[in-house]
């Protein structure tokens, strides 16, 4: 029986993949005949027969998209087909800006509530305030069951200079406000401040077109404030533009030092070296990484580690050592195809095996840098200073805490709004952390809110209480001091940050 099913499925799968080859080839190189003549290929004939003769209506676009996805799965985990809508969103992240109304919001009981209005942005100019609830946009109802932030975002975003009419609820009154959309920056650096009198801290979320420029401004500011050493936090940074990682690495390394090289079956070796005197070639450097630090983050970390320029601290990185190039397709989509591997200055490819093709008999190579560190290939970037996976990971995996985390934003925003005069008197983010009376009051209010809404029946452990209280305090700090406040509170008791400084 099992063999019969396989026999039936196999021709379908083969046909599916063959169709993909045709479609991708047509999109990428439409002017080239696949077989050197003008006759229709077998693939084209099959496509036309399906299109014109198949028993049921066929959504050819959907079939094509699914077929491409199946083909790419056979290659590697990082070759990707992006539909037009997905491409637009991915491009925004790499561009470092998007077009919208300039607000942050959270969903509270299926209603989008404005939690922050960008200064001098389109919404502030129009009179939108924190606490306003979004009811409609251009007549489209935005209060609905099972609402999502993606749905709300897609409604209020739009082309620059276009107008969106918002219906908002403020103090039980309904208001109509027109907002003229504009370009909104999407910073790559989430936070930069002095950890102590001599240590500058920069948290880089992604490598976008603005990352290097933002990095240089942050370094200049920190040095002017007295920073003599630098902590660059790449935790959770999944990568982005290789060129930005190379430019940032250049600021740490002497001129002409190799930063990274790429090479592929169809791509000749291409070396990237430091080209100019760097802004931070002297002074201690700490790079923080975790299991979500990938790609361009690993390029930067690998260069720093291979040249003994700084210490890598945290957990072993993701292990993505493949380079993608983007090809625009005729239907408005794009193919991000792996064309090369990248190698650290010592020659390490840190790409972990994929498709369960790990060769257990293969003897992995290791390399020694001038610090006599043993550095392995095909295993991501292993930190010089390893930090055990924090208790946070185990905590967040518990159902009790997972549910609680979804309610922190709503609780914190309301607490902040109800006590705004109190927070206006606070002068630094760390003053919140040192205020034990505030911590007790927050926890008492949290427990009261939880019991009132019957959100949990399981008592919180001491560790869970500490974890939640710190995150509520950090979220409160964000409402007043933005991301710098948030990370100053969280980093105060962060084991990776503190270990790096010891």
Regions found by a protein language model. Name each.
Residues 54-115, 161-191, 490-502:
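Extended, small/polar residue-biased N-terminal targeting/export presequences
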Residues 259-261, 311-315, 345, 349-352, ...:
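Acidic/polar loop patches that form or flank catalytic/metal-binding clefts of enzymes
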């Amino acid at each position: 029986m099992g063999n019969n099913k396989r026999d039936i499925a196999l021709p379908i799968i083969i046909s599916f993949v063959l169709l993909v080859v045709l479609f991708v080839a047509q999109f990428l190189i439409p002017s080239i005949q696949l077989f050197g003549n003008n006759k229709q290929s077998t693939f084209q004939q099959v496509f036309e027969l399906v299109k014109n003769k198949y028993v049921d209506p066929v959504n050819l676009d959907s079939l094509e998209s699914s077929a491409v996805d199946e083909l790419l799965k056979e290659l590697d985990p990082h070759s990707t087909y992006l539909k037009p809508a997905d491409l637009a969103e991915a491009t925004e992240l790499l561009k470092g800006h998007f077009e919208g109304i300039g607000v942050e919001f959270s969903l509270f009981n299926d209603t989008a509530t404005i939690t922050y209005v960008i200064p001098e942005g389109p919404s502030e100019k129009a009179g939108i305030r924190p606490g306003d609830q979004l009811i409609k946009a251009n007549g489209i109802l935005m209060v609905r069951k099972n609402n999502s932030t993606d749905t709300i975002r897609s409604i209020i975003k739009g082309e620059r200079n276009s107008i969106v009419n918002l219906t908002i609820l403020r103090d039980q009154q309904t208001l109509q406000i027109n907002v003229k959309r504009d370009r909104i920056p999407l910073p790559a650096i989430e936070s930069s401040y002095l950890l102590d009198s001599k240590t500058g801290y920069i948290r880089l979320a992604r490598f976008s077109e603005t990352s290097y420029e933002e990095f240089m401004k942050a370094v200049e500011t920190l040095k002017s404030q007295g920073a003599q050493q630098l902590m660059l936090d790449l935790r959770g940074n999944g990568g982005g533009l290789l060129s930005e990682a190379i430019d940032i690495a250049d600021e740490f390394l002497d001129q002409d030092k190799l930063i990274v090289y790429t090479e592929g079956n169809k791509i000749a070796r291409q070396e990237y070296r430091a080209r100019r005197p760097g802004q931070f070639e002297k002074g201690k450097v700490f790079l923080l990484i975790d299991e979500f630090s990938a790609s361009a983050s690993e390029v930067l970390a690998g260069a720093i580690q291979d040249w003994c320029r700084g210490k890598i601290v945290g957990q072993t990185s993701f292990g993505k050592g493949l380079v993608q190039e983007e090809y625009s397709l005729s239907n408005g989509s794009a193919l991000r195809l792996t064309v090369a591997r990248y190698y650290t200055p010592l020659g390490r490819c840190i790409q972990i095996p994929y498709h369960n093709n790990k060769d257990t008999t293969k003897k992995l190579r290791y390399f020694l840098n001038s610090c006599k560190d043993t550095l392995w290939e095909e295993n991501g970037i292993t930190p010089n200073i390893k930090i055990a996976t924090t208790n946070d990971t185990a905590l967040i995996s518990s159902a009790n805490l997972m549910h609680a985390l979804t309610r922190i934003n709503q609780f914190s925003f309301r607490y902040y709004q109800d006590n705004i005069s109190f927070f206006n008197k606070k002068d630094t983010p760390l003053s919140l952390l040192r205020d034990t009376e505030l911590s007790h009051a927050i926890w008492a209010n949290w427990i009261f809110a939880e019991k009132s809404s019957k959100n949990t029946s399981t008592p919180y452990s001491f560790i869970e209480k500490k974890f939640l209280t710190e995150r509520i305090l950090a979220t409160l700090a964000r409402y007043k001091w933005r991301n710098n406040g948030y990370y100053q509170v969280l980093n105060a008791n962060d084991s990776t940050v503190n270990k790096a400084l010891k």
